[in-house]
A protein has these predicted regions:
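Short glycine/threonine/proline-enriched tight-turn/helix- or strand-capping micro-motif at secondary-structure
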Residues: 2-3, 51-55
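Single conserved hydrophobic/aromatic residue that forms the stacking wall/gate
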Residues: 196-204
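N-terminal pre-domain segments of enzymes
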Residues: 1-12
Length: 204
């Protein structure tokens, strides 16, 4: 997948900056947080790892889904082109919603992915929501499992332990989570100009 660049025929918009953000308390999908602006939202820089920025265990030890959200708009003059949203990395599972509709899912926190927006855009502001799941297991890279809070270190549920789930990593580095690399919108022409190539014996 080629990295997008700004050219005479391509628009490039970087969505890096401060987004609205909320830890899922288990009701995010039930209450359809992706359909409307997040209530009582925190702010979170993108790109960044949310569990390495905020103080307290609520963020650092969060297990499950979080929601990122912001408004986007696309100039009218580029709507005749192919409009693409590109996420360079989201750890570890992403669901992208535009104006409340699911338009893309991606598993894997270390590779870029993209989705065309043309069929989902409306005039004016568009509500972009990216739901991110940080759960690791033996189908993810890196691999891991599920443990209860403190039980992994204590060998069982002891005094002061909690049955709150948490990731049990099978690796020796921090599990950075969230939208960890830039999110961009770029455009390309709908068609490629006809180009005639003539081969010669010299290979030129």
């Amino acid at each position: 997948m080629l990295y997008p660049v700004l050219t005479q025929s391509r628009l490039l918009s970087d969505l890096s900056g401060v987004w609205n953000f909320k830890l899922d308390n288990g009701k995010g999908f039930e209450e359809k947080w992706y359909e409307k602006p997040l209530k009582d939202a925190d702010t979170m820089p993108v790109p960044a790892s949310y569990n390495d920025l905020k103080e307290g265990t609520d963020f650092r030890d969060h297990y499950g889904w979080v929601f990122y959200q912001r408004n986007i708009s696309v100039p009218e003059y580029v709507k005749s082109q192919r409009i693409v949203l590109r996420c360079a990395a989201v750890t570890h599972y992403a669901m992208i919603y535009l104006n409340g509709k699911l338009i893309c899912e991606h598993k894997g926190g270390f590779l870029p992915f993209e989705v065309e927006l043309n069929d989902h855009l409306q005039d004016g502001d568009n509500l972009l929501t990216i739901a991110v799941n940080n759960v690791i297991d033996y189908t993810t890279l890196p691999v891991g499992g599920k443990a209860n809070m403190m039980s992994g270190m204590m060998g069982g549920m002891g005094a002061g332990a909690s049955d709150k789930p948490q990731n049990n990593p099978n690796f020796d580095f921090f599990n950075y989570c969230g939208i960890t690399r830039p999110v961009k919108i770029y455009t390309t022409p709908e068609t490629v100009s006809y180009t005639h190539l003539r081969a010669h014996e010299t290979g030129r």
